[in-house]
Amino acid sequence: MNFECIINHIERTALDFNRSKGERAVPKVNELNIASQKRDRYPGNHKKVTEGYERIAVGDAMELTQFGVNKVTVAPGASTALNHWHENEDEFVIILSGEVVLVENNNETTLRAGDCAGFKAGEPVGHHLINKSSEMAVLFEVGTRRDNEVVNYPGVDFTYRKVNGIVTFVKKDGSVAT
């Protein structure tokens, strides 16, 4: 267990103790105490698209259940995701620093610090962000949390399916994508 994990455990224990006494601790978490995560969930060679994407799941650290909040860094040349759209979950991003290119279908829009973009659930417009600059980009991504979700990837032979919280990537022929 590393030092950051120990601090996180101590903070969580204190929070749980206060809640058990009917008290609410100050809802404060420092992002420096949260381990970052890489996005490597895609099957096969598709993982390469998001090399250079890292997130800090601040919403998880705050025990939020209705929506996720991630502080994301995107290295030059990296994408936040494959081109996709959600059937049941809204998405929102706000750029904190640097710049990324929002790709929606074949249209590109540059987003810089302070710019926001939102993606309504059920609208079949494929989208993703790419850092085409030479500097790191930092953004917040916020999205609905559903136990059941389908994410479509136009131009790719699989979909993301979440049923009762269990995630599977399924090919168009019905087999599991690996």
Regions of interest found by a model, annotated:
Residues 89-90, 94-100:
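Glycine- and acidic-residue-biased ligand/ion/polar-headgroup-sensing regions
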Residues 121-148:
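Ligand-binding loop in jelly-roll beta-barrel domains
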Residues 70-86:
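Conserved short histidine dyad/triad with adjacent acidic residue
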Residues 106-121:
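Short acidic-glycine-tyrosine-enriched beta hairpin
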